[in-house]
Amino acid sequence: MIRVIFAEWRKLRRPTLFLGTLGAALFFTGLTTTFLYLMIDSEQGNSDRGRQVGREVLQLAGGSAYGFASVGGLLGIIALCVFAAQTAQEYTYGTLRNLLVRQPGRIRILIGKLIAMKIFALILVVIAAVVSISLSYLLSDRAKVSTDLWFTSDGFHEIGKTLLNVAISVIYFGIVGMVLGLLLRSPISAISIGVLWILIIENLLGAVKPVFLDWMPGSQLTTIAQGGSADISYSHALTLGTSYVFIGAVIATVLFVRRDVAN
């Protein structure tokens, strides 16, 4: 399994993939965090769906990580795309057959690939957290947001909690991408269906009837990153999100073990 992890990591650390993915993650992280502070007095809102996040919220102990928590859903979508592409392209390029010759254990291959991609995702999460918190501190003075509580013991506790929540959310998004890659065996199909569902279909359903968002998988995973929301509790999102991911992973694993490797 160690060899599978290193083999997968060798592909993940290619400059075109690693730097490109990191660039996308930092772009959305910087954009979300910057808007949060520069538009703090805007009547159009400074957060998702036009919500207003005021100084009284950002001045709390967890204010330094608020921007990072807000971008967790977008980081998750990036992870979904990477996991889906790395999984499905084994079928597209026919490399899975070669892997099985050297390592016949399909479960070992699957777990090894998942571990390597989890490490990749966690690195992105940590870097994004550092950038977001740094930007928040730099922009706090301009936005007239007090940072007195940010770096106290309570503040560091909130940072750690947010980091854990975002990491869980991003890895869950990634596993969803891996499941789609195993089911569809096509990078384009897996990515397009995953992104289309999370960004468009769920929002359309939510616009028609907001209660639908209480049960949509993408909504649950995004809420996990945010530590809960006014509409969905953290425990509800974590329980339901974990259930979706677990069921999908079991189905995809069974199919991966039993299906022919040909695309």
Residue ranges of model-derived segments:
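Aromatic- and glycine-rich beta-strand/loop motifs that create alpha-glucan
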Residues: 1-27
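Helix-capping/transition residues at the boundaries of transmembrane alpha-helices
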Residues: 11, 88, 99-101, 177, ...
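Residues that define the loop-to-transmembrane-helix transition and helix capping
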Residues: 16-19, 107, 188-189
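Secretory targeting signals
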Residues: 18, 22-86, 110-184, 203, ...
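Central hydrophobic cores of alpha-helical transmembrane segments
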Residues: 21-28, 190-201, 213-220
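Transmembrane helix boundary and interhelical loop/hinge segments in multi-pass membrane proteins
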Residues: 80-102, 106-107
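Short hydrophobic, aromatic-rich alpha-helical segments embedded in or entering the lipid bilayer
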Residues: 209-229
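Junction motif at the cytosolic side of a transmembrane helix
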Residues: 243-263
